[in-house]
């Protein structure tokens, strides 16, 4: 049986590890809530912008207009954008995105397309750089809660590449936040743009609460303040194509920001779940080690008693 000191050291190490994972779980839980609130705050603007673009798009069907960002070209070159995190300890979050990106890359190459990668996050950069993928751009160091300025910088580069005919389509692989324990890697086409209704009547949110003295997260719902429908008879001062070409870059920035926000929320939720599982496992391991320690201590005491009894019997004999 293991030495008592070794078991004591392991118990101490496991308990210290549990303190760390529990702290990381609480930090991730607080940041998940903040990330969700950011998504909810931006939804009314995104909804109103989407409705305006739909209205303009429907009018353009009956007019001669030119909207380069919506132009459906013959596709030869595709830019594939993958969003991962800069850090680990978040379960399968990064691995799932990398796997989905590799699958999509193989699909497109199999169909004869020229594919370029734009990788966001140090995990994707490290993985694809070591495997000789055609990487066009590497982006890292984004805020944990993405900002509009960061989305605008990335969107500007995408627009320049698309308008210069450097790429015919831009696809984004990111993690869609479904709920606290469920996140799904999804594929979305960013360019050419196709405005559509993005309103979601109800968003699931999570509130910090306590359960038997322990901080935890409780799911709930919050109705989104969606924008009203745009009247069909509204009169715009500018022509539809002028408005469309002015608003489409803003729409792209907003869509990209949403992808970054959902990815950030998914990473934090995955980290919270991973740290929660690690804390539970550490608790169970500490119990097992404590039981082993008590058994070893009992065996040592029993052995000492037997030796004393044996010695007394020998002396008396």
Swiss-Prot record:
Task: Look up the coiled coil feature and give its residue ranges.
Answer: none
Annotated membrane topology? Peripheral membrane protein
The protein's matches in Pfam families, at most eight in alphabetical order, are given as: ATP-synt (PF00231)
InterPro entries reported in the protein's UniProt record: ATP_synth_F1_ATPase_gsu, ATP_synth_F1_gsu
What subcellular compartments does it reside in?
A: Cellular thylakoid membrane
Q: Which GO terms describe its cellular component?
A: plasma membrane-derived thylakoid membrane; proton-transporting ATP synthase complex
- Name the UniProt key words of this record, in alphabetical order: ATP synthesis, CF(1), Hydrogen ion transport, Ion transport, Membrane, Thylakoid, Transport
Q: Which domain of life is it from?
A: Bacteria
Molecular-function GO terms, alphabetical = ATP binding; proton-transporting ATP synthase activity, rotational mechanism
Family recorded in the similarity comment: Belongs to the ATPase gamma chain family.
Per the entry, what this protein does is: Produces ATP from ADP in the presence of a proton gradient across the membrane. The gamma chain is believed to be important in regulating ATPase activity and the flow of protons through the CF(0) complex.
What is said about its interaction partners and assembly? F-type ATPases have 2 components, CF(1) - the catalytic core - and CF(0) - the membrane proton channel. CF(1) has five subunits: alpha(3), beta(3), gamma(1), delta(1), epsilon(1). CF(0) has three main subunits: a, b and c.
| Protein name, UniProt field | ATP synthase gamma chain
């Amino acid at each position: 049986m293991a030495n008592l000191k070794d078991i004591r050291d392991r118990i101490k190490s496991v308990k210290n590890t549990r303190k760390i994972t529990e702290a990381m779980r609480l930090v991730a839980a607080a940041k998940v809530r903040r990330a969700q609130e950011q998504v909810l705050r931006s939804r009314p603007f995104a909804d109103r912008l989407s409705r305006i673009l739909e209205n303009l798009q429907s009018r353009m069907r009956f007019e001669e207009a030119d909207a380069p960002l919506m132009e459906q070209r013959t596709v030869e070159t595709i830019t594939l954008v993958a969003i991962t995190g800069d850090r680990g300890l978040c379960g399968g979050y990064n691995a799932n995105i990398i796997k989905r990106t590799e699958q999509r890359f193989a699909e497109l190459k199999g169909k004869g397309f020229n594919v370029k990668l734009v990788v966001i996050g140090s995990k994707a950069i490290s993985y694809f750089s070591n495997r000789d993928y055609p990487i066009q751009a590497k982006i890292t160091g984004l805020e944990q809660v993405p900002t509009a300025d960061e989305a605008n910088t990335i969107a500007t580069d995408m627009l320049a590449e698309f308008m210069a005919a450097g790429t015919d389509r831009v696809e984004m692989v990111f993690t869609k936040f479904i709920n606290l324990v469920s996140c799904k890697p999804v594929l979305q086409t960013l360019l050419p743009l196709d405005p559509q209704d993005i309103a979601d009547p109800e968003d699931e949110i999570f509130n910090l609460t306590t359960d038997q003295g322990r901080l935890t997260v409780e799911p709930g719902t919050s109705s989104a303040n969606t924008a009203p429908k745009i009247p069909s008879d509204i009169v715009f001062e500018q022509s539809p194509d002028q408005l469309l070409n002015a608003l489409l870059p803003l729409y792209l920035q907003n869509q990209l920001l949403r992808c970054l926000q959902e990815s950030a929320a998914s990473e934090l939720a995955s980290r919270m779940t991973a740290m929660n599982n690690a804390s539970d496992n550490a608790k169970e391991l500490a119990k097992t080690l404590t039981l082993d320690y008590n058994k070893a201590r009992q065996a040592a005491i029993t052995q000492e008693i037997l030796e004393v009894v044996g010695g007394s019997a020998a002396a008396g004999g």
